[in-house]
């Protein structure tokens, strides 16, 4: 990754790392790079519910206007909503202000091209190069400056698109929604109510400061309790920008991205919709998933962690379903990025079409016990150069004797080293993780 761009755009603590000054420059330079060959360029901007969103939006808009770009403000909307609308209204580019599932202090700026896909590496590199140079970009004046307008009705256009991806309404299904006090708060309840579902909601009272705070896809235990309390048929949890989905079955069991991918891949294969009989996953997907897919004669392609890598593999190989255990699910026949609400619709639609409860769909295979820990470090990239970390990993793998696996990697978006272990029992998982974590802490230090 570059100096500014990580695996998912530019991220950092708002107002100290991701400052209004940097947002202004990103707007100005990003606007130039993405629209320099366009006539009458326009750029869409959306944001999640973070308190810093308006501050960064103001700076970003100013930068875009200063380069002569028309800006259409979408207001609070999901990341996939921005991706969809960028292509749908033939905009030159789209920008989302969000740090997804990260805490409220963080924020991020992510660009989309006119096709609704994330930027190419070379486009990000061009923006980065210009960020570090003295500003010699054009400075239009008078009537050549950009103008900004609100396009809040864009959200309705996006919801209409989502609704037409399912076969029928959801009458008779009680759905519990957890919107993470984020972008889905004003979207998901309307979407599922319009489809005649009986809905109960939580995490739908954003105040700028409570996004992802004990709610949403990174805290599915809250939704599990809510599903049980409301006696719902299914629970659907989104993250702050609604590009992820984690589900909960009617018994209160958590159904993660791996389970959702299996359910969707199996259904799509049965309906003749799964291109090349292949599912694209990441190295984080559970061993149990691969064994279950093998039994269904569904092939898998494995990528590095990050939905951008899943998408790259899907586009390269001509596949139409892929995703991550964390809940990024990509339905490439419908949209150009992971979409939590679209994934939720497909999952409920499969329940409706098969007449099965979510627990029945999810219980068709068992996951290997898996333990994941995050270690906060001063330099996450040092994990790849350190000698003692690979040594302890090798030691653990020898102890496993082929009955499990280890993955240690730097986070793409936070100052963390992530350690994942799968083994035959939870006790073994915990023991192996602790053994590796002790070495990572000792070698790389903690902030």
Swiss-Prot record:
Keyword field contains Nucleotide-binding: no
GO cellular component: cytosol
Annotated EC: 5.4.2.10
Biological process according to GO: carbohydrate metabolic process; peptidoglycan biosynthetic process; UDP-N-acetylglucosamine biosynthetic process
GO terms, molecular function: magnesium ion binding; phosphoglucosamine mutase activity; phosphomannomutase activity
Record's comment on post-translational modification: Activated by phosphorylation.
Phosphoserine: residues bearing it: 100
Family according to the record: Belongs to the phosphohexose mutase family.
Protein name: Phosphoglucosamine mutase
Organismal lineage: Bacteria, Bacillati, Bacillota, Bacilli, Bacillales
């Amino acid at each position: 990754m570059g100096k500014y761009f990580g695996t998912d755009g530019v991220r950092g603590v708002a107002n100290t790392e991701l400052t209004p000054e940097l947002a202004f420059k990103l707007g100005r330079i990003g606007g130039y790079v993405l629209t320099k060959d366009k006539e009458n360029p326009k750029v869409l901007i959306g944001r999640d519910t973070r308190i810093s969103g308006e501050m960064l939006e103001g700076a970003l808009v100013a930068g875009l206007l200063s380069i002569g770009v028309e800006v259409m403000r979408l207001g609070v909307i999901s990341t996939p909503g921005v991706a969809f609308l960028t292509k749908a209204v033939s905009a030159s580019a789209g920008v989302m202000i969000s740090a997804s599932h990260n805490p409220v202090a963080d924020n991020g700026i992510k660009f989309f091209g006119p096709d609704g896909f994330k930027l190419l590496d070379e486009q990000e590199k061009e923006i980065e190069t210009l960020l570090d140079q003295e500003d010699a970009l054009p400075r239009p004046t008078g009537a050549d400056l950009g103008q900004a307008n609100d396009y809040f009705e864009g959200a309705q256009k996006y919801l209409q698109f989502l609704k037409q991806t399912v076969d029928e309404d959801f009458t008779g299904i009680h759905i519990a929604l957890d919107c993470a006090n984020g972008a889905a708060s004003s979207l998901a309840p309307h979407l599922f109510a319009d489809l005649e579902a009986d809905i109960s909601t939580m995490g739908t009272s954003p105040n700028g400061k409570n996004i992802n705070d004990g709610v949403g896809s990174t805290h599915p235990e809250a939704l599990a309790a809510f599903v049980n309390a409301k006696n719902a048929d299914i629970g659907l949890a989104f993250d702050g920008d609604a590009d992820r989905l984690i589900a909960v079955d009617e018994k209160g069991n958590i159904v993660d991205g791996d389970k959702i991918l299996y359910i969707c891949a199996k259904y799509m294969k049965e309906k003749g919709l799964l291109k090349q009989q292949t599912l694209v996953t990441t190295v984080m997907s559970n061993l149990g998933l691969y064994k279950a897919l093998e039994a269904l004669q569904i092939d898998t392609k494995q990528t590095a962690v990050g939905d951008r890598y899943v998408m790259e593999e899907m586009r390269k190989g001509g596949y139409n379903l892929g995703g991550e255990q964390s809940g990024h699910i990509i339905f490439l026949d419908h949209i150009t990025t992971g979409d939590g609400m679209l994934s939720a619709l497909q999952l409920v639609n499969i329940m409706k079409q098969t007449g099965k409860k979510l627990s029945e769909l999810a219980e068709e295979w068992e996951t290997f016990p898996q333990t994941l820990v995050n270690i906060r470090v001063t330099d996450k990239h040092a994990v790849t150069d350190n000698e003692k970390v690979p040594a302890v990993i090798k030691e653990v793998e020898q102890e496993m004797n082929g009955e499990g696996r280890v993955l240690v990697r730097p986070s793409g978006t936070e100052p963390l080293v992530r350690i994942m272990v799968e083994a035959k029992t939870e006790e073994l998982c915990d023991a192996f993780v602790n053994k590796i974590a002790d070495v990572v802490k000792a070698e790389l230090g903690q902030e």
